[in-house]
Amino acid sequence: LFTGRPDGRNVGIAARAKQELEGFVTEPDHRNLEYVTDPQADYDGIAEALLAPRRQLRRWLMEQGLTLLPGSTLSLGDTERFERSDPDNPYHSLIEATYGTAVVTASIHINLGIDNPAELFAALRLVRCEAALLLSLSASSPFLNGRITGAHSQRWLQFPLTPERVPLFLDHQHFITWTNQQIQAGAMHN
């Protein structure tokens, strides 16, 4: 989520939101923040679990003359600099060095809420096969620094930097083994 003024100007308040609002977490660039919900095993509570924190955040932001900005409008901000939420965090240094300063899109990370590892990896394979469709329906950030990029999504232009070939994991051990191999080869970071 991106926060700012009603005119679209970005104002980073992630650290304060994390301190004052339950469930909110900071991102490497403090203009962006996220919240974490508990896993849901059925669909009935998902909409409220996703929307309740946003309502809480909107009320909190209104008290400060701020609002939520759609992810596609962060491009109105300055992408020439990275506004670190924690200058001493080595992970944040890695993100800045790897992706640069043009982190301009918001996202939802989906927790599938599946306890059984075999069922979880079957679901992950399905999501992975449908990922391009899901991204095309959800990712929308065609602007950068107030200009049209020519792409549907800035996110697609820069994320994710993964190894060229990622398998459809058979099970949890396959995932662990492959990930450890990538870390040892320097293709991924942990």
Describe every region a protein language model picked out.
Residues 36-38, 109-113:
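Residue-level recognition of well-ordered beta-strand positions that form the cores
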Residues 102-106, 113-190:
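Loop-rich catalytic cores of soluble enzymes, especially ATP-dependent carboxylate-amine ligases
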Residues 1-99, 104:
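Terminal catalytic/cofactor-binding subdomain
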